[in-house]
């Protein structure tokens, strides 16, 4: 969702009702940890466990148009905020290609971006084990954010 907010912040998705709706929803920066970015890559990752037909019929078919319409890779623009992405190579839930694709889309748009793919750590490690490899993402983010004067 962070990638979507960072790329679709200017989309009208509801009728404005209050003054606050006039404020920009653009975040100052984006952190994506092991993100699902692309519909096609989501299908590909799911095929590790289920046939493609099952995934489409039971999980994604009703959302297909929305998922394709709001693909952060396709919506990346120079107006989006700087992007910090991290992932593990052994993540069995999301493919590293999601992270790589979003990083490349941000770069192509001329947006400051940084990508880290750790060799191992799986999926869902959150803030990670400070003693493990994945725990390094927090300090890497701080260093990156300082280099851009975000913090």
PLM features per residue range, with description:
Residues 23, 45-62:
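A catalytic-pocket lid/entrance helix-loop region that shapes and gates access to the active site
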Residues 26-29, 80-83, 109-114:
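Loop/turn elements at helix/coil->beta-strand transitions in domains of secreted/extracellular proteins
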Residues 38-39, 90-94:
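Acidic catalytic loop of the alpha/beta-hydrolase fold
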Residues 79, 84-87, 91:
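Short beta-strand/loop motif that positions the catalytic acidic residue
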Residues 86, 96-151:
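C-terminal catalytic histidine-bearing segment of alpha/beta-hydrolase fold enzymes
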């Amino acid at each position: 969702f962070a990638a979507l907010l960072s790329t679709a912040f200017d989309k009208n998705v509801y009728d404005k009702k209050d003054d606050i709706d006039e404020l920009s929803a653009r975040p100052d920066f984006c952190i994506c940890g092991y993100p699902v970015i692309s519909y096609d890559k989501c299908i590909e990752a799911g095929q590790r466990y289920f046939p493609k037909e099952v995934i489409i019929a039971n999980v994604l078919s009703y959302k297909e148009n929305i998922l394709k319409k709001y693909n952060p890779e396709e919506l990346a623009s120079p107006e989006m905020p700087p992007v910090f992405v991290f992932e593990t190579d052994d993540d069995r839930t999301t493919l590293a290609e999601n992270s790589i694709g979003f990083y490349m889309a941000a770069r192509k748009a001329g947006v400051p971006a940084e990508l880290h793919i750790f060799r191992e750590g799986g999926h869902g490690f959150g803030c990670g084990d400070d003693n493990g490899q994945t725990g390094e993402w927090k300090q890497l983010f701080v260093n990156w954010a300082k280099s851009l004067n975000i913090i």
